[in-house]
UniProtKB/Swiss-Prot annotation:
Designated gene of the protein: ATG13
Name this polypeptide is given: Autophagy-related protein 13
InterPro entries reported in the protein's UniProt record: ATG13 (IPR040182), Atg13_N (IPR018731), HORMA_dom_sf (IPR036570)
GO biological process, one term: protein localization to phagophore assembly site
Quaternary structure, from the entry: Interacts with ATG1 to form the ATG1-ATG13 kinase complex.
Species annotation: Debaryomyces hansenii (strain ATCC 36239 / CBS 767 / BCRC 21394 / JCM 1990 / NBRC 0083 / IGC 2968)
Superkingdom to which the source organism belongs: Eukaryota
Length: 837
């Protein structure tokens, strides 16, 4: 008999089983549609046209009108999408399985179809810098390039806790996941490639594969194969991975992940275009930047010599990069993907071409070397670790680009010892700076180690030794040899264009860009270094060590660059300084720095004061011209009396209105016989008036005429000084236009760009004062000109300093308010004209 307790347990079990079965059946249906919905979203964003995508837009609820009634709408997960292009045959494997624990992982591969290429076309891929890299040639064995690999799997080993009513939660999580997937597929590089390939012969295709079956890589370029060399990538890898948030259920976990290429700029080019680009790159960089069909055939011959240990292997399965390794079914699929090695054997010519292409393109990106010969990277270089001489390695790290490389690998001198290699090196940047002065050059050469420590980007130039040939010397740049004044061997002497006349000194010759003046520059301290004997010609370094190196049989016999630098510094220090007039000193005597600087300052001040003599000459010449013009004009007397007196201001602009640098510095001989004190000069500069006012006409000095002491004559002498002021020329320029003088007497270059100002002859104002003395007027004019001539010739001492200072402080009184405004305006205009000059 069955106990009542047993009946209760059996009845509870029978009641639970139908509910669990129903829940599992619904969950299985959700999992099946999860796979089909993922395929539908990926295919729609990759292979369908834009017009079709517009008709099949994302819709949340509702109906789509105007579409074919026969096509069904997939409304799962609130994404209304048509099932027109859904591959039903490929999806049967996941639709017909009732036991979800046996459901295999699904792989969706998105590839670039190359079957439509012609024989004269080549597909290239551009990297982040725009450099083209060859993918495949039309008619080759490679027909596909894998762009993306999607992995949709159900992991039965990872389950969640028992939830009685979990279907609504799972369904809501799936809705969020598919909406994210829908948007992400349109942000990936392959979607951009799809838009760019609308008018080309390239197409994008998709494949749905069983994750448990091995994937053949024959005739394809796998996702794990980088078309762009790793050292040319800006990222760590050529592809990226994305894992979406998994959805956990009581039966297992739903996962979606993707691995895709980062670069999508595929394009088609004709072989003739690539060939022309190839020759252009040879002319520019002496390197190939494009792959040619000839190189492909050459690489096919080289693949026979490849060692099996150097072949690129897929150590890690392609699918292992996109899903977890703990899935048993996924591990079986990943292990089955090792036949990619056959693809490697079939694609050796392309991979080998890409390797060579990467090195050549890397060389083309560096700056042009200084040597005349092209730099080549030989594949049989001892730096390569490959056992085969015809292969080039894949560089694990990006090489450092040295833009100042001199010479090539094949023409470089053989290495000697570490001591020689470290001691016989010299930075080019010491004398390559043309804009640096000799003082800064000497400062750098006095401390060569500290000055050259900052030049990290320049390359070291080794000095040629006994084993160096003429080829290396000829490839040395001409500019370096001329700037360092080096004595090159035989042909380099002809290359420099001059020879050394003698060898009387062991001081090295540093050639100058001034040409023939270099010999005059160093003639006092050093002689020319003659050409060395032919027996010791190869012992001379490229940087031209001292002539004493000719006596040495080896280039490293104790003579270093520092010795030559010290000789050069001593040669510069022994050069005599520039001596000013009055700064008398013997070249052999040692004068302190303070005494020398003070003497130089005094000499410069004395030279600057010579400008004032030029102003005195200008004033005297202007006065003489006006007197001469007055004598010839014979104009009528003016009705207005002149208000100017002997205390009128000098014909100059006010203090501070112009800079002394605008005044011409003409070496005048007016003060050769005069002894003007320095205090008078400083007083004249402080008062704001030129020092030429100190040398105003002295009426108390010796003269051979007696009428100069009369008031009338004094008025005549002072009138020319006031007649050239801007105020007087502006107020009276319309009264008499017969006399024209361009510019002021003190600064004749101020009004060159302005209109010529007509000055009034102010001597007409003074005709009323001595009209009764008409018989003596002509004699007085002649005597006045004689007086001015004597003044210019003798230049006596000036005794009218107080008179000049007084006249500079008392401006002329015009007597009208409007004249004061015009005075300010004219001085302002004068400042503007000075600023322009």
């Amino acid at each position: 008999m069955v106990s009542p307790g047993q009946n209760d347990l059996s009845s509870d079990k029978s009641q639970i089983d139908p509910f669990v079965k129903k829940q599992n059946a619904k969950l299985t249906q959700v999992i099946q549609n999860f796979f089909s919905k993922s395929v539908q979203i990926v295919l729609q964003s990759r292979i369908q046209s834009e017009s079709h995508n517009k008709e099949e837009q994302l819709k949340v609820g509702g109906d789509v009108g105007g579409h074919n009634v026969s096509s069904k709408i997939n409304k799962w997960f609130n994404l209304h999408m048509y099932n027109d292009n859904l591959p039903k045959e490929e999806l049967k494997l996941w639709k017909n399985i009732n036991d979800v624990s046996q459901m295999p992982p699904m792989i969706i591969e998105v590839y670039l179809d190359l079957r439509q290429l012609t024989a004269i076309q080549t597909v290239i891929l551009r990297d982040d810098n725009g450099n083209p890299w060859t993918v495949a040639k039309g008619g080759s064995k490679k027909h596909e390039v894998v762009l993306e690999r999607w992995l949709i799997e159900f992991d039965a080993n990872t389950v969640s806790g028992t939830i009685v009513d979990e279907l609504p939660l799972i369904y809501k999580q799936a809705i969020i996941l598919f909406r994210s997937l829908y948007g992400y597929t349109r942000l990936m590089p392959t979607f951009k490639l799809k838009k760019n390939l609308n008018k080309s012969n390239l197409n994008i295709g998709c494949k749905i594969l069983d994750g448990k079956q091995p994937i053949s890589s024959k005739g394809r370029i796998g996702l794990s194969k980088s078309i762009i060399p790793h050292q040319m990538l800006t990222t760590e890898s050529h592809m990226s991975h994305k894992h979406f948030l998994p959805i956990q259920t009581t039966l297992g976990t739903l996962k979606i992940s993707i691995a895709y290429r980062n670069h999508h700029e595929f394009s088609i080019h004709d072989n003739e275009e690539l060939l022309s680009t190839h020759f252009v790159n040879i002319d520019d960089n002496d390197k190939d930047s494009e792959i040619t069909p000839v190189e492909i055939e050459f690489k096919e011959e080289l693949k026979i010599d490849r060692d099996s240990t150097t072949n690129e292997k897929v150590n890690e399965p392609e699918d292992d990069e996109s899903h977890h390794a703990d899935v048993e079914s996924s591990q079986e699929h990943l292990q089955s993907e090792e036949p990619d090695e056959s693809f490697e054997q079939d694609a050796k010519h392309i991979s080998g071409s890409r390797k060579k292409f990467s090195i050549s393109n890397n060389a083309s990106m560096s700056l042009s070397p200084c040597s005349s010969g092209p730099q080549t990277v030989t594949e049989d270089s001892p730096s390569h670790n490959k056992p085969s001489a015809n292969t080039t390695p894949i560089v694990s790290q990006r090489p450092t680009i040295n833009p100042f490389k001199v010479g090539s690998i094949s023409t470089s001198p053989p290495a000697t010892t570490n001591f020689g290699g470290s001691s016989l090196e010299r930075k080019v940047s010491i004398t390559s700076n043309k804009s640096a002065s000799n003082a800064s050059l000497a400062a750098m050469l006095r401390n060569p180690r500290s000055s050259t420590s900052s030049t990290n980007t320049t390359a070291n130039i080794p000095i040629a030794n006994n084993n160096s040939n003429n080829q290396y010397n000829s490839t040395f740049p001409r500019s370096v040899s001329s700037s360092h004044g080096s004595n090159l061997a035989h042909d380099n002497d002809n290359l420099l264009g001059f020879s050394n006349p003698d060898n009387t000194s062991n001081t090295p010759r540093f050639s100058s860009s001034f040409g023939s003046r270099a010999s005059r520059r160093f003639s006092n301290t050093s002689g020319r270094q003659s050409s060395l004997p032919s027996g010791n010609m190869n012992d001379t370094s490229l940087l031209a060590t001292s002539a004493g190196s000719a006596s040495s049989d080896a280039p490293m016999s104790g003579l270093y660059i520092d010795d030559d630098i010290g000789d050069f510094v001593r040669m510069i220090d022994s050069k005599s300084d520039l001596r000013f007039s009055g700064y008398n000193s013997n070249n052999d005597s040692k004068i302190s720095y303070n005494q020398g600087s003070n003497s130089q300052i005094d000499a410069l001040n004395k030279f600057q004061m010579l400008k004032n003599q030029h102003q005195q000459l200008s004033d005297s010449v202007s006065a003489s011209l006006i007197l001469h013009h007055n004598q010839l004009s014979g104009s009528r007397p003016s009705s207005r009396k002149s208000s100017h007196s002997i205390h009128s201001p000098p014909p100059s602009l006010p203090s501070g209105s112009y800079d002394n640098s605008h005044l011409p510095s003409i070496n005048s001989k007016l003060r050769e016989n005069s002894s003007t004190s320095g205090n008078d000069d400083n007083l004249a500069r402080d008062s704001g008036t030129p020092s030429s006012r100190k040398n105003s006409f002295d009426y108390s000095t010796n003269s051979n005429t007696t009428f100069l002491k009369s008031p009338i004559t004094n008025k005549l002498v002072s009138s020319p000084v006031t007649s050239t002021t801007p105020i007087h020329s502006c107020l009276h320029k319309t009264n008499n236009e017969s006399g024209v003088i361009s510019g002021l007497a003190t600064t004749p270059s101020i009004y060159n760009d302005r209109r010529q100002i007509h000055y009034e002859s102010v001597f007409d104002d003074d005709d009323d004062d001595y009209a009764n003395n008409t018989a003596d007027n002509r004699d007085q004019d002649d005597s006045l000109k004689l007086y001015l001539t004597n003044k210019l010739a003798n230049a006596p001492k000036s005794n009218t300093n107080s008179r000049s200072l007084k006249s500079s402080t008392n401006p002329p009184n015009i007597g009208e308010d409007d004249d004061d405004d015009d005075d300010d305006l004219l001085f302002t205009m004068s400042d503007m004209n000075l600023a322009k000059h």
